[in-house]
A protein has these predicted regions:
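N-terminal segments that cap or nucleate solenoid repeat domains
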Residues: 2-40
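Glycine-rich hexapeptide-repeat left-handed beta-helix
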Residues: 1-15, 49, 55-57, 63-65, ...
């Protein structure tokens, strides 16, 4: 079973939409708001013990992602995003709608990834805002190009597939509770 507990500091409990899939080994603590269709995969840690974390509709938080923030700050992840395996989001931070944060990438400390942007695998975005539809790469991350107006990242389109996959896993664990032990 996932660890879903209130903040020991504030007593605030996670608010998780009933359609969300939370993997049995995920951990969600405190002031966390998870919207419809979100899927939080195995080993992910979302720690809102002294901050607020919002995760928008149909966003995928993949295996071993860590999301946290400085005290009394906000992490705001939009709808239809994919936060790739082993990524770290440390706030205050904003990931706008339709973004893809690549495998092992970091968006930290006053960063803002603009709508429809891609933070490449392994990149580190620190204290920087990017405009919409940016390809952001490197350490420290820099904008390499702008995607055309109206373009949608393939990864962002895939958020719907991850939402469907989350539904299937949710059904599997509900039908077979012994799998969660």
């Amino acid at each position: 079973m996932p660890i879903i507990i209130p903040s020991p500091w504030t007593g605030k409990e996670p608010q998780i939409h009933q359609s969300a899939f939370i993997a049995p080994t995920a951990t969600i603590i405190g002031d966390v708001i998870i919207e419809e269709g979100v899927n939080v995969w195995f080993g992910a840690v979302i720690r809102g013990d002294w901050c607020t974390i919002k995760i928008g509709k149909n966003t995928s938080i993949q295996e071993n992602v860590t999301i946290h923030s400085e005290s009394n700050k906000l992490v705001d992840i939009g709808a239809n995003c994919i936060i790739g395996h082993h990524a770290m989001i440390h706030g205050p931070c904003v990931i706008e709608d339709g973004c893809l944060v690549g495998i092992g990438a970091n968006a930290i400390h006053n960063s803002k990834l603009g709508t429809g942007s891609l933070l490449a695998a392994g990149a580190v975005l620190v204290n920087k805002e990017t405009p919409p539809r940016s390809l952001v790469m490197g350490i420290p991350a820099t904008i390499k190009k702008q995607f055309p107006e109206g373009s949608v990242l393939e990864g962002a389109k895939s958020s719907g597939l991850y939402a469907e996959n989350g539904k299937k896993f949710k059904e599997l664990f509900e039908k077979n509770p012994e799998y969660s032990k």
